[in-house]
């Protein structure tokens, strides 16, 4: 008979959100044995962004236990011992294959069952694989993805095995840009391929993208736009040797890294909870349509108060904050204390080579570009504002200081009126500093 365990609270998923939720439970007061984290990964929760950045450095690379949560936000590092000391059970390397919300039961791949009173769904996303589309040769060796530490270890091993070789990066989003830089720093010959007219099209304007594309080109990264990978060639050992593109060209490759997005992991809950916009629908406290079941991070579609609409956000900042909000709401319900509704200011950032940008707010409306966006400058510093209905709704800054980044965040939060767009262009960062 497979084992059954009961907990008052269960967090399903072992990523960033799980770690920040555990810290909030400890802060609010949780008794030993009340809380469990069930994760299919073999390690305690860690800061996932390190995998596409410091983990791949050729020197002084980041390794666990160095980047367990909550170091990414300047907090204490929660090692496995921390969970034991708090009486929080870490149930690792455990895949849940069935969730029955009516009977409050989770079943693992080996038939173990876990029952709970309150569930936090923090399952995150899975990477979209080219094999999902039946791309020919997509299961060849050294075609890699990046989501978990295991994936990063495979990539590091491939980087070492194929030293100085040719890398093709499929995808022009965050992962594409960060990994192209990482492979270049590791002395690979790097080509980036994506179907859109410019990189990071969901956020960047053509002007912003032009800077990064030129900067990368100057660093020796080749960029192929407007086409996709339709197949891969492999040698007798099954190792990838080339990428065939839809435009007819063929790129030699020793390593291929694919970053074409993720899918929220909601399958276990299909038909049991209300869904919207590809995620599990929640209220401002991250409670779902099923009382006592909460969803946080990538999987949650929640009311974004600032813009008065339901949104789903895939970003580490929201994973941290939504997890904390859900725990505050759970504990608030128990103690009868009211909790403030989640009021999230969208925030995205990235770092690659010597660059680092931040974006706050909403990228809708007309845009202006200000500052020095010359990719050959020693220290480029430039930004953009998004203006709609006479107000600034979004702000982007490359190369900003901590104070300057705070200033653009304040602009996005307060949405100041703009009388004259030409004036705003001239003022640039000064406009933000005055708010």
Swiss-Prot record:
- Which InterPro entries did the record assign? FAD-oxidoreductase/Apoptosis, FAD/NAD-bd_sf, FAD/NAD-binding_dom, FAD/NAD-linked_Rdtase_dimer_sf, MDHAR3-like_C
Q: Which Pfam families match?
A: MDHAR3-like_C, Pyr_redox_2
What reaction does this enzyme carry out catalytically? 2 monodehydro-L-ascorbate radical + NADH + H(+) = 2 L-ascorbate + NAD(+)
- Report the subcellular localization: Cytoplasm
**Entry EC number(s):** 1.6.5.4
Binding site residues for L-ascorbate: 320, 351
Nucleotide-binding recorded as keyword: yes
Please give the annotated consequence of changing residue 70 to A: No effect on catalytic activity
What top-level class of enzyme does the UniProt entry assign? oxidoreductase
What's the reported outcome of changing residue 320 to A?
Reduces catalytic activity 5-fold
**Which keywords does this chain's UniProt record carry?**
Cytoplasm, FAD, Flavoprotein, NAD, NADP, Nucleotide-binding, Oxidoreductase, Redox-active center
Q: Name one GO cellular component term.
A: cytoplasm
What is known about its induction? Down-regulated during senescence.
Q: Which cofactor does it need?
A: FAD
Q: Which GO terms describe its biological process?
A: cellular oxidant detoxification
> What are the binding positions for FAD in this chain?
14-17, 41, 48, 53, 96, 147-148, 298, 316, 349
**Where NAD(+) is bound, by residue?**
172-178, 196, 202, 261, 314-315, 349
**Binding positions for NADP(+) per the UniProt entry:** 174-178, 202, 261, 314-315, 349
Q: Which GO terms describe its molecular function?
A: monodehydroascorbate reductase (NADH) activity; mRNA binding; nucleotide binding; oxidoreductase activity, acting on NAD(P)H
Question: What's the family?
Answer: Belongs to the FAD-dependent oxidoreductase family.
Q: What does this protein do?
A: Catalyzes the conversion of monodehydroascorbate to ascorbate, oxidizing NADH in the process. Ascorbate is a major antioxidant against reactive oxygen species (ROS) and nitric oxide (NO). Can use NADPH as electron donor, but possesses lower activity compared to NADH as electron donor.
UniProt-recorded name of the protein:
Monodehydroascorbate reductase 3, cytosolic
Give the taxonomic lineage as stored in the record: Eukaryota, Viridiplantae, Streptophyta, Embryophyta, Tracheophyta
């Amino acid at each position: 008979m497979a084992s059954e365990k009961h907990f008052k609270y269960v967090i399903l998923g072992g990523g960033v959100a799980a770690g920040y939720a555990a810290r909030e439970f400890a802060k609010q007061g949780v008794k030993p044995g009340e809380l469990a984290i069930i994760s299919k990964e073999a390690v305690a929760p860690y800061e996932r962004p390190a995998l596409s950045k410091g983990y791949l450095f050729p020197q002084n690379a980041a390794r666990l236990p160095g980047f367990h949560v909550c170091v990414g936000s300047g907090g204490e590092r929660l090692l496995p011992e921390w969970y034991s000391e708090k009486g929080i059970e870490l149930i690792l390397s455990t895949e849940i294959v069935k969730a029955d919300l009516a009977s409050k039961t989770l079943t693992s791949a080996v038939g173990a069952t876990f029952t709970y009173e309150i569930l936090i769904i923090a399952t995150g996303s899975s990477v979209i694989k080219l094999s999902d589309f039946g791309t020919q040769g997509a299961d060849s060796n050294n075609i890699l993805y990046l989501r978990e530490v295991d994936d990063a270890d495979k990539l590091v091993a491939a980087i070492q095995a194929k030293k100085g070789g040719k890398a093709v990066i499929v995808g022009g989003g965050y992962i594409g840009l960060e990994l192209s830089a990482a492979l270049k720093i590791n002395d690979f010959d790097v080509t980036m391929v994506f179907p859109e007219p410019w990189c990071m099209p969901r956020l960047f304007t053509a002007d912003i993208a032009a800077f990064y594309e030129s900067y990368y080109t100057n660093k020796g990264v080749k960029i192929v736009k407007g086409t996709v990978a339709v197949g891969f060639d492999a040698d007798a050992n099954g190792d990838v040797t080339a990428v065939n593109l839809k435009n007819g060209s063929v790129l030699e490759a020793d390593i291929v890294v694919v970053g074409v997005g993720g899918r929220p992991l909601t399958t276990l809950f299909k038909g049991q909870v209300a869904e919207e916009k590809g995620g599990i629908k929640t209220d401002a406290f991250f409670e779902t349509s099923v009382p006592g079941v909460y969803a946080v991070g990538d999987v949650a579609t929640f009311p974004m108060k600032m813009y008065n609409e339901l949104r789903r956000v895939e970003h580490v900042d929201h994973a941290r904050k939504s997890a904390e909000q859900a725990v505050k709401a759970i504990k608030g319900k128990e103690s009868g204390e009211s909790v403030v509704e989640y009021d999230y200011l969208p925030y995205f950032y990235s770092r690659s080579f010597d660059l680092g940008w931040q974006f706050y707010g909403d990228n809708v409306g007309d845009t202006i570009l200000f500052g020095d966006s010359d990719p050959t400058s020693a220290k480029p510093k430039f930004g953009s504002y998004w203006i709609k209905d006479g107000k600034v709704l979004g702000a982007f800054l490359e190369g900003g200081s901590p104070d300057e980044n705070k200033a653009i965040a304040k602009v996005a939060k307060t949405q100041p009126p703009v009388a004259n767009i030409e004036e705003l262009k001239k003022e640039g960062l000064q406009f933000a500093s005055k708010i």
